[in-house]
């Protein structure tokens, strides 16, 4: 094995250190045997991470994860005041992957490969050194997966979710609801997301696209109101809560503390907040580059044309938030389930992109295009 960071393999404490024990950091660490480094460590914060349900459309890089999914749905809906659109895909069913299950799996694989897992808070880094609350560590190569702060004013996908247990069977366990816009639209682009695990148990999230995060009470009231209005649920048990905020924009790449990967390295799809499949794609490309003897280099998992389309789309919905339900309805109506899954995972070809463009109302997008300078 060779040290990509320096010719003298004994000069550093570790040949490579991964900062951050989240999805990107541990997804890389679990494949340490494919890296051209001898001694590898992961530094992760001491704080216990909140368990999240990750929504995943499968792609070529998610096979190991999809087999661990809590549940998959071959049918899903987009619902607006215009009606409900049901899409289906047996090839790319929508999956719910629990973060705890995946991260535990990655840690186990990493440990089995001899990766050292270190708990600590990183306070500073240089090209080859990392300062933590327990002292300094040196490394030939540093990978940094910690999320950057979301810039003020950027659109954010923010949400609170409750996994609920109903007293009677009210959910359709064979059909997920990815977006239901029949809820309070006064605070931004707001929809309810429902993943039914059984006829009586489901994850229900209140999600908003806007630059402003609301008080918890707003999301929780929206969940209760929705369950009462559309499922007749007034008495429920909350089994679990989750909360999050995801940037909806192209974040500036930060190479100051090592090679950025994951959200820090631009893996989040701006228009959707989808990240898991793109993180796996980014890591696969990074490993292939290293295995071929090339130096580590940041690699975006997105195509430039998709990022360009996302920029225009985000500008349109930010300037016209009330138009958003119509746009998502139109896209769902124009695409098959397979098409939707391909588009969301970045596997679209030009014909599919054209389908999406043709489904959209032209005037708002032309205005956004002219204002963006093309």
Give the role of each language-model region.
Residues 113-234, 249-254:
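Predominantly flavin-linked oxidoreductase catalytic cores and closely associated redox partners
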Residues 27, 31-82, 160:
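N-terminal FAD cofactor-binding segment of flavoenzymes
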Residues 184, 210-289:
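FAD/FMN-dependent oxidoreductases across multiple families
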Residues 24, 48, 123:
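Conserved Rossmann-like nucleotide-cofactor binding loop
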Residues 19, 143-145, 260-262:
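Redox-cofactor binding/interface segments in oxidoreductases and associated redox assembly factors
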Residues 59-120, 125-127:
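A conserved beta-strand/loop capping segment in the N-terminal third of enzymes
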Residues 5-41:
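N-terminal Rossmann-like FAD-binding beta1-loop-alpha1 element of flavoenzymes
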Residues 284-374:
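C-terminal helical "tail/cap" subdomain of flavin- and related membrane-associated enzymes
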């Amino acid at each position: 094995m060779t040290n990509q960071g320096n010719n003298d393999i004994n000069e550093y404490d570790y040949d490579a250190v991964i900062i951050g024990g989240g999805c990107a950091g541990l997804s890389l660490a679990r494949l340490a045997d494919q890296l051209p480094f001898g001694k590898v460590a992961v530094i992760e914060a001491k704080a216990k991470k909140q368990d999240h349900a990750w929504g995943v459309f499968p792609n070529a890089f998610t096979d190991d994860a999809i087999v661990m999914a809590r549940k998959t749905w071959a049918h899903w809906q987009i619902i607006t005041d215009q009606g409900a659109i049901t899409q289906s895909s047996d090839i790319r069913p929508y999956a719910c992957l629990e973060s705890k299950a995946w991260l535990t799996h990655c840690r186990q694989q990493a440990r089995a490969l001899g990766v050292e897992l270190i708990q600590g808070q990183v306070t500073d880094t240089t090209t080859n050194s990392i300062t933590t609350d327990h002292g300094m560590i040196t490394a030939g190569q540093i990978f940094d997966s910690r999320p950057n702060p979301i810039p003020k004013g950027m659109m954010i996908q923010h949400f609170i979710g409750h996994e609920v247990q109903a007293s009677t069977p009210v959910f359709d366990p064979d059909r997920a609801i990815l977006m239901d816009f029949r809820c309070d639209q006064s605070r931004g682009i707001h929809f309810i997301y429902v993943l039914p695990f059984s006829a009586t148990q489901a994850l229900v999230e209140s999600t908003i696209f806007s630059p402003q995060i609301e008080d918890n009470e707003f999301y929780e009231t929206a969940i209760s109101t929705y369950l009462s209005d559309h499922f007749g649920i007034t008495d429920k048990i909350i089994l679990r809560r989750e909360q999050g905020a995801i940037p909806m924009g192209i974040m500036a790449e930060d190479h100051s503390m090592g090679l950025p990967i994951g959200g820090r390295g631009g893996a989040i799809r701006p228009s959707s907040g989808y990240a898991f499949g793109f993180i796996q794609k980014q890591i696969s490309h990074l490993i292939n580059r290293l295995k071929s003897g090339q130096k580590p280099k940041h690699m975006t998992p997105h195509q430039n044309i998709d990022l360009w389309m996302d920029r225009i789309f985000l500008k349109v919905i930010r300037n016209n938030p009330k138009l958003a339900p119509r746009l998502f309805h139109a896209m769902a109506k124009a695409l098959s389930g397979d098409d939707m899954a391909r588009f969301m995972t970045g596997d679209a070809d030009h014909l599919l992109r054209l389908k999406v463009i043709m489904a959209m109302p032209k005037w708002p997008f032309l205005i956004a295009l002219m204002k963006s300078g093309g």
